[in-house]
Amino acid sequence: MSLNIETTQGLERRVAITVPTEIVSKAIHEEFKRAAKNVRVDGFRKGHVPAHIIEQRFGASIRQDVLNDLLPRHFFDAVIAEKINIAGRPTFAIETFEEGKDLVFTATFEVYPEVKLQGLENIKVEKPTVEITEADIDKMIDVLRKQQATWAESQDIAKADDRVTIDFVGSVDGEEFEGGKATDFVLFMGQGRMIPGFEEGIVGHKAGEQFDIDVTFPAEYHAENLKGKAAKFAITLKKVENMVLPELTDEFVAKFGPNTKSVADLRAEIRKNMERELKNALVSRVKQQVINGLIEQNPIDVPASVVEEEINVLRNQAAQRFGGNTQQAAQLPRELFEAEATRRVQVGLLFSEVIKSNELKADKERAKAMIADIASAYEQPAEVVEYYSKNKELMNNIRNVVLEEQAVDAVLAKAQVTEKVSSFDEIMNPQA
């Protein structure tokens, strides 16, 4: 077998492969022998069908079967011998496939780029340091109390955190627009669900009042005909309700678990949960900075075929989130996912090189600690640990996550790392 490799463009390669006629003839002969033993033809006993009948009835399909075997087998033999790191699937083009002649074909495929890490010392990472305060716990308790709140009708003016019931009719240039009208609409004030200025226009009014609100739709509003338009809403305020928070009693805290018997227990449980969430958020924030730095310092081309596979993964995930199926996923525009898919492939290749160059292997103790941390969020942590230990797929996922964390640590050891004192809210609600 002879081999000729050429670079077509970027990461695309074309390999011309010649398979000697004796190998082709032997493969065809062996396939005909197998067929002669197994084919059934009316009027002949199994294994006694004449050769010319087999040729006439099955010759074309037998040769196609031989071809389907020879092409990938000799292609992969060739790329393994040449140590080519193939990405995706090859496409084959037959040049010659005739009795008594060499099989000549070409395979077009992509290769993974050669990654040589550089510039790790130029990567800048800001590592937040956070201490959870009693005030942070107080805020979390307030959230829990609001989740259990009741509502009491009020004759006072509407304010933030109230619940109001309204009728409204919206118009632009004196004309009502689609979707701008509602009756008995319940609005939780202060949550920012409506366009800017809408809730603020209700504040200060009482139940029974009718009034107008002037607002402007945001330039990025989803309805094309309303983007940036000035609008007027005629409001009828039908009801104002004040939020009534439950008292922080032992009876209240008992709702949050069998082991929560006092306010002190609740605060301890909240702190534990906040610490776990904070730890995950900090790991994620540092990891994203490392990823951004790696990509910036190591721009690499990625195989289009692998990006396409990742696009399909993202498509299917998006469809599943909204209850769709595979057919619906295929209809989603690839442009929605291309940038994220490309980034994922880049990250995978760069992390693989970090792991390879540092000879990293998943730390068993670190994996155990990660499983224990996950299990601590459940009522029966021992059962969760056992479940993980018996599930190969879950264990592989844990090892991969641990390996990625070790890769991040390896980059951090060479990067420019600075610490910044931050609050719990700054880390957990960065957009607030």
From Swiss-Prot:
Name of the gene: tig
Species the sequence originates in: Haemophilus influenzae (strain PittGG)
Family of the protein in this entry: Belongs to the FKBP-type PPIase family. Tig subfamily.
Reactions listed under catalytic activity: [protein]-peptidylproline (omega=180) = [protein]-peptidylproline (omega=0)
Comment text on domains: Consists of 3 domains; the N-terminus binds the ribosome, the middle domain has PPIase activity, while the C-terminus has intrinsic chaperone activity on its own.
Protein name, entry field: Trigger factor
Domain PPIase FKBP-type: 161-246
Keywords: Cell cycle, Cell division, Chaperone, Cytoplasm, Isomerase, Rotamase
Gene3D superfamilies, alphabetized: 3.10.50.40, Trigger factor ribosome-binding domain, Trigger factor, C-terminal domain
GO CC list: cytoplasm
EC number: 5.2.1.8
